């Protein structure tokens, strides 16, 4: 009987430890997922080069403006 009680206590401790660990995981997963770029953002990066690249129209620079042939912030 004592062995059963000890076994149940150990199981309860392990389950509570697992619950605490699982509560922390979603936050880490959210951080990881928020850093990932969507396919649309990746495509936009390919179409719109670095802001130091030359441009002739504002839309070529994505969210930047085109001034004197270069993207400005």
Swiss-Prot record:
Expressed by the venom duct. Disulfide bonds join 48-62, 55-66, 61-71. One of its GO terms (cellular component) is extracellular region. This is Conotoxin Gla(3)-TxVI. It is found in: Secreted. The modification 4-hydroxyproline is found at residues 49, 54. The presence of a 'disulfide through disulfide knot' structurally defines this protein as a knottin. Pfam families: Conotoxin. The modification 4-carboxyglutamate is found at residues 53, 60. Residues 20-44 form a propeptide. One of its GO terms (molecular function) is toxin activity. The modification 6'-bromotryptophan is found at residue 64. Residues 1-19 form the signal peptide. Keywords: Bromination, Cleavage on pair of basic residues, Disulfide bond, Gamma-carboxyglutamic acid, Hydroxylation, Knottin, Neurotoxin, Secreted, Signal, Toxin. Belongs to the conotoxin O2 superfamily. It comes from the Eukaryota.
